[in-house]
A protein has these predicted regions:
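Positions that flank functional sites
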Residues: 33, 108, 131
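Extreme N-terminal starter segment of soluble prokaryotic enzymes
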Residues: 1-3
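Conserved catalytic-core motifs of GNAT/GCN5-like acyltransferases
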Residues: 104, 117, 122-138
Length: 145
């Protein structure tokens, strides 16, 4: 297993993985923006035998972190890759002295919700029709100390 910061050379693979995983995926342009222009954005990738198999994207804006995406290629799920990416991201989030970390997750994504609860997040509120397809989201928060 190898973990590293994403580079612009990863953008096509990130986009392919995104489109295979999410109902409303980020576009190639959005990934390019996150990697090249958004000064608050960080993307860590997980590689297995040289193959990019997952990533986490998060923002650190002053004393708040936001987890935007956690994605692992389907055949590599439940092997600890997401947890390792999460742990590495939180090392950076703590180092940057963030007070809280937030995220939104589809109410139907039970695996992700359980993962976030296991990692200390709490459901704060349900956001009605948060996603473009009308699905609700949970807004979840974790204190970072």
């Amino acid at each position: 297993m190898e973990f590293r910061l994403a580079t612009i050379e990863d953008v096509n693979t990130l986009c392919e993985l995104e489109h295979a995983t999410f109902k409303n995926p980020w576009t190639l342009e959005h990934f390019s923006y996150e990697l090249k222009e958004n000064e608050f954005s960080k993307t860590l990738v997980a590689c297995h035998n040289g193959l990019l198999i997952g990533y986490i994207n998060y923002w650190i804006i002053y004393d708040q972190a936001t987890i935007n995406k956690v994605c692992i290629k389907e055949e590599f799920r439940r092997r600890g890759f997401a947890q390792k990416l999460f742990d590495l991201a939180f090392q950076e989030i703590k180092k940057e002295e963030c007070m809280i970390c937030t995220l939104e997750v589809r109410v139907s994504n039970h695996n992700a919700i359980n993962f976030y609860l296991k990692n200390g997040f709490e459901k704060v509120v349900k956001k009605s029709a948060y996603y473009s397809d009308g699905e609700d989201a949970y807004y979840m928060v974790k204190g970072v100390y």
